[in-house]
Amino acid sequence: MEQKISVALKEIKRGANEIIGLEYIEKLVRKYYETNERFIVKAGFDPTAPDLHLGHTVLIQKLALLQQYGARVKFLIGDFTAMIGDPTGKNETRKPLNREQVLENAKTYKEQIYKILDQKHTEVCFNSAWLDALGAKGMIELCAKFSVARMLERDDFAKRYKENRPISIVEFLYPLLQGYDSVAMGADIELGGNDQKFNLLVGRFLQRAYGLNKEQSIITMPLLEGLDGVQKMSKSLGNYVGITEEPNAMFGKIMSVSDDLMWRYYTLLSAKTLEEIEDLKHGILHQTLHPKAVKEDLASEIVARYYDNDQAFKAKEQFSKVFSANLLPEILLESDFDEGVGVLDVLKQIGFCPSTSQARRDIQGGGVKINQEVVKDESYRFVKGNYVIQLGKKRFMKLNIN
């Protein structure tokens, strides 16, 4: 029993930025092993875009892990709060979505998350179920439990207040409503990104304020770096891997990450144990394993998770064909730009380079091709047409210039 609990806690802590209330988590896991009684784990997602990428799955993978140790996952789609817009980390007021946009974006979430989570022990919730019913009286009671001074402890709010930038009252409501979700759902544990710590602590505080006889533990997970290894994975930055992408594109993108970033992806995305990952590192260190083969295993694992082993095998074969013969892949990702855009800006915006300075160095080093011709002029600008831009041997993208 003690050995099982020790292993469980080690895996739960894996990759986490911070855990608040570890003793309570241990108590919950122990009770599950003794009585088979499951505990409630909550994680919320605002459906501001229709598709999930690997950055989102860091939390979902941790939810799946917790299911192995007794969690009943409540996967919260914040259809109500998405209409406010999470201001976390923003230096200006964020434009909210309307309900039609939110519900449209949420349509594919269930199909996507069940590629990772055990459906039997997962409940998908929408926070409009209780927040719509809260009403004016309930909202005032909720606001009365928190002070403006406490709100201004949040770095992003404090910065905007100091710089005389606008902060709407509605934005103050976001962490309160997210915290109230924990009250309504009776969460034992809440997961969130490390930028969400303040909001998660509000939930813990409100559970006490509303008289619940528990105080949720908190697990914060890091934001996954995108393919560039610099900025967080984001569709808007072009450095993402979507979980609904074609297998070949998914495999090729994962193979494009640096060897150092590969270990970050292993820790946060792979189902391999920490011991197995250490064995892989040991193999590379002692030259019994090649980094490319280890990266191929990671790419194969991730493709198989969202498709199947056969698709993963075919994607690996396709990548080997492209890599060895320096051929263009059959499936290319696409980006649209306006006529006149410069090659330096394109390389940065599609996530091939973290900065225009790096893009300039890559061009000077002969590493950038357009339609398989080496780019020598860093001031090159695109005219209307279709192009394939390439960085190194493995990174390709189709450009549609309008």
Curated annotation (Swiss-Prot):
Keywords noted in UniProt: Aminoacyl-tRNA synthetase, ATP-binding, Cytoplasm, Ligase, Nucleotide-binding, Protein biosynthesis, RNA-binding
SUPFAM superfamilies, sorted: Alpha-L RNA-binding motif (SSF55174), Nucleotidylyl transferase (SSF52374)
GO function terms (MF aspect): ATP binding; RNA binding; tyrosine-tRNA ligase activity
Pfam families for the chain: S4, tRNA-synt_1b
Catalytic activity, reaction form: tRNA(Tyr) + L-tyrosine + ATP = L-tyrosyl-tRNA(Tyr) + AMP + diphosphate + H(+)
Known function: Catalyzes the attachment of tyrosine to tRNA(Tyr) in a two-step reaction: tyrosine is first activated by ATP to form Tyr-AMP and then transferred to the acceptor end of tRNA(Tyr).
Protein name in the entry: Tyrosine--tRNA ligase
Organism: Helicobacter pylori (strain J99 / ATCC 700824)
